[in-house]
Swiss-Prot record:
Organism: Bacteroides fragilis (strain ATCC 25285 / DSM 2151 / CCUG 4856 / JCM 11019 / LMG 10263 / NCTC 9343 / Onslow / VPI 2553 / EN-2)
Protein name, per record: Uracil-DNA glycosylase 2
Localization annotation: Cytoplasm
Record field: catalytic activity: Hydrolyzes single-stranded DNA or mismatched double-stranded DNA and polynucleotides, releasing free uracil
Record keywords, A-Z: Cytoplasm, DNA damage, DNA repair, Hydrolase
Lineage: Bacteria, Pseudomonadati, Bacteroidota, Bacteroidia, Bacteroidales
Signal peptide: none
Amino acid sequence: MNVQIEESWKTHLEPEFEKDYFRTLTEFVRSEYSQYQIFPPGKLIFNAFNLCPFDKVKVVIIGQDPYHGPGQAHGLCFSVNDGVAFPPSLVNIFKEIKEDIGTPAPSTGNLTRWAEQGVLLLNATLTVRAHQAGSHQRRGWEEFTDAAIRVLAEERENLVFILWGSYAQKKGAFIDRNKHLVLSSAHPSPLSAYNGFFGNKHFSKTNEYLKAHGKTEINW
């Protein structure tokens, strides 16, 4: 199956594209886009991969579901398009960055600049029906994104995996902690941010680890 995804990822994920679950998923997604308003726009489904080739990945942040409001989702977890109001979780992410490393909140919630520095901003589910949170869960995306995380964890070394909330922590449970840095805390959602997200210092810890392993730090 010819999937429109960045070449290095295509090479590493090729086996997935031939599996029955992925064929079923593709049929489902095509059908959904033809009948409903689906986010993100079709050409941005694999945006996280396209902006961050396999060998350039330094950090992986695992999200759950794309934003389901108009103009928000563009294929990167927690990120929104330029000119779109910051969702509450993103507000809290920027608050923690300011508290942790002193960088003030930017004027845009578009995290493309992180992706271009090697941060894979990966949602577990890559599509969603407008205004229906979780509507594309358990259709096969989770299996596909598990495969992406697994191939990174197995074939790369000294990556940083950032797992916010129990969902991301379960998804990253198999990652070898001797080979990679795994940072876990509560989710930045207003419902849980004060239960361990604020003060987690994940941004400075990530950069300390990257620096210790001879990698360029992320300009958060």
